[in-house]
């Protein structure tokens, strides 16, 4: 979500210097940052295993897996926009490369802004209300993107979807860490594993389905998936 500005910078570097120089610069910067922060990493204190494992064992708690499914249902639509929105605008709406890239940047930008505001929003309203209203807004955004007839319509729709998707995963992760019948470490591990399966396994099937049925059908399906979160 913090990649909206680097998208433009990266595009400029690729255009000016080519992919190899771009990758070299990114690798050098990443290495420099890693080496600079390494001495300041806080060392883990040794904790006895008996203290680490508290509460019920994972297989005894159905709630934690239910939360994991919610995270999965939220991450798959996010993945569909991140990986395929630009392709959708290029192939279906005849957008230019710049406009297609902007659609993803707008999605990432609105998602970043409202994710930073997530704590304030959840403190003002309860988490369940935020979860349901956010999934509804995200579903409306993706459905509007599927029905768009112009690149700018889809760009605005993806921006709206970003607002809705922003706090779905954080709320799920927060719930995972606050379950009374399972330790925080175990709960977070289970939910993040289930949730990130969406980003790992979803891109290829989404692309395959899009080739068969078209991207509008894909984003309509993603909207329905978000609707499932609202009803849970």
Functional labels for PLM-detected ranges:
Residues 2-5:
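Short, small-residue-biased leader/transition segments that mark boundaries at the very start
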Residues 14, 114-126, 210-211:
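Helix-to-loop junctions at the C-terminal end of transmembrane segments
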Residues 14-28, 207-226:
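A membrane-interface helix-boundary motif in multi-pass transporters
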Residues 22, 27-48, 231-232:
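C-terminal membrane-cytosol helix-exit motif in multi-pass small-molecule transporters
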Residues 61-77, 159-163:
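Pair of pore-lining "gating" transmembrane helices in MFS-fold secondary transporters
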Residues 83-99:
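Short amphipathic helix-loop junctions that connect adjacent transmembrane helices
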Residues 129-144:
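Structural signature of the two symmetry-related core transmembrane helices
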Residues 167-180:
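Intracellular juxtamembrane helix-capping segments at the cytosolic ends
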């Amino acid at each position: 979500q913090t990649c909206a500005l680097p998208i433009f910078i990266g595009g400029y570097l690729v255009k000016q210097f080519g992919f190899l120089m771009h990758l070299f610069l990114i690798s050098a910067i990443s290495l420099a940052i890693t080496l600079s922060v390494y001495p300041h990493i806080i060392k883990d204190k040794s904790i006895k295993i008996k203290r680490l494992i508290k509460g019920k064992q994972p297989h005894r708690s159905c709630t934690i897996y239910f939360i994991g499914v919610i995270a999965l249902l939220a991450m798959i639509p996010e993945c569909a926009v991140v990986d395929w929105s630009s392709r959708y605008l290029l192939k279906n709406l005849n957008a230019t490369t710049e406009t297609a890239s902007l659609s993803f940047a707008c999605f990432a930008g609105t998602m970043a802004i409202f994710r930073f505001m997530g704590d304030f929003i959840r403190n003002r309203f309860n988490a369940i209300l935020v979860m349901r209203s956010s999934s509804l807004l995200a579903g409306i955004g993706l459905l509007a993107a599927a029905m768009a007839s112009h690149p700018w319509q889809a760009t605005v729709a993806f921006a709206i979807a970003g607002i809705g998707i922003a706090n779905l995963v954080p709320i799920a992760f927060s719930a995972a860490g606050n379950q009374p019948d399972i330790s925080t470490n175990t709960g977070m591990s289970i939910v993040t594993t289930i949730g990130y399966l969406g980003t790992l396994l979803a891109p290829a099937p989404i692309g395959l389905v899009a080739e068969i049925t078209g991207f509008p059908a894909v984003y309509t399906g993603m909207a329905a998936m978000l609707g499932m979160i609202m009803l849970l």
